[in-house]
Amino acid sequence: MKHFFALLLSALMVLSLLTACGDKTTPSDGDDQTVTDENGSDTDNNTDDTTDPYDAVRSYWSEDQLTQAWGPDQVVEHLFFHPIIAYPQWAFHDCNASQDQRYGLDDWMVTVDEYNKILQSVYDKGYILVAMEDVWSEVTDETGTHMVRNTLMLPEGKKPLVISFDDVNYYPYMLDEGFTSKLVVGEDGEIWAQCTDPYTNETFLTKELDATPILDQFVYEHPDFSLNGAKAIFSLTGYQGILGYRTQDDRDIAADSPDRPCLLYTSDAA
């Protein structure tokens, strides 16, 4: 059953990302979530307003504005990110990670500040997010089933960009190294990240320390950065869970344990 709910949450979040889909709140055990807004006052996420705030993003560009053809022989740029570092001081200096682990973080990850600057930079350079299914199509003909590049219709002066998030699993080892711990669908229908401050052990929900809700907010504030509501793609391996939810069974956990017995196989042949 836990596999089903995690996969359902994954599907909802991927759909939200592909179709357009901070603040800080203390998680509640009840049905309500109280969010602290930018003025410091508490607001109830529960609302009867059924208007999707990202409708404006999806409908920002009208068809008559898409006058630039981007053909199959032209490059569609791709940026991919591993989980971003929420607490760089902790990750690079104060946690118990080895020096090699810190080098790995520096090689493969970016901090929240770096990520925000990258988004602003590609936006300023005229890139626009496009959905992968608009870039490629699966076709079946007499030669079989294969993928073909499509011609994109873009606003004049824009360049297509695909963003993907790799390893959106929130591995257990990362929880001690200054990262957020899972993605949560809030009562407002939007994606939040759960985070524990490594210095205070306070656990809270945030939209400011994780790549997914940061991109959500950036697109919401810059609707011209997205074509038809496109945002990012999740790359899920399923290893050690999905989106911060542990879906592996006891056999998987035992196989990952450094204390697992080592079996030696010998040949019975003379």
Please identify what each model-predicted range represents.
Residues 1-2:
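N-terminal hydrophobic targeting signals that begin at the initiator methionine
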